Amino acid sequence: MGATLVLVRHGQTEWSLAGRHTGRTDIELTTAGEATAKALAPALADVDFDLVLTSPRFRARRTAALAGFTEATVEDDLAEWDYGDYEGLTTPQIRESVPGWTIWDHPVPGGETPDEVGARLDRVVERVRATGGRVLVFAHGHSLRVLAARWLGLPVQDGRIFDLDTATYSVLGDDRGQPVVQRWNVGPTL
């Protein structure tokens, strides 16, 4: 049996609620974000994880702590996509100057390319697979979607097919050597 990777997207923030691209900006969870992060705890509490990792961003670290994982190891490679000049903007705002823009297909001035994000998350995949066990990660919408794509052997751009809400968990694993999605975008019960 291969490794199992449990992905948790951080709880809601004011910027995630507004659809603003939030990469480097370190912002707090909303009251609702704190509540849903706490509500994740029962779903994760009975699992014995071999490794627990978190993005260095406060919103991910706070979600980990509220879900009961105060000792999560910070992993810089789990940071959200660096949106460069588009930090804090919404997709409709960006499309005013770049019609049809998506993070998956267009350059991000002053930010990361899909290949750069993919390289970071490939290192996470390698680290998880090397454990051969259960690994829990707390991170962000775009970075987790890329991580899922790379786990499955798909191109970075295929991260676009994975919708991911805040304060949800997803489970990736292996079925007879084939990387698979076992659960996706499961929310806590409040």
What do the PLM-derived regions correspond to, one by one?
Residues 5, 131-141:
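Generic beta-sheet signal
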Residues 6, 73-75, 182:
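General small-molecule cofactor/ligand-binding pocket signal
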Residues 11, 55-57, 77, 121, ...:
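Short, well-ordered beta-to-alpha junction loops that form the rim of enzyme active sites
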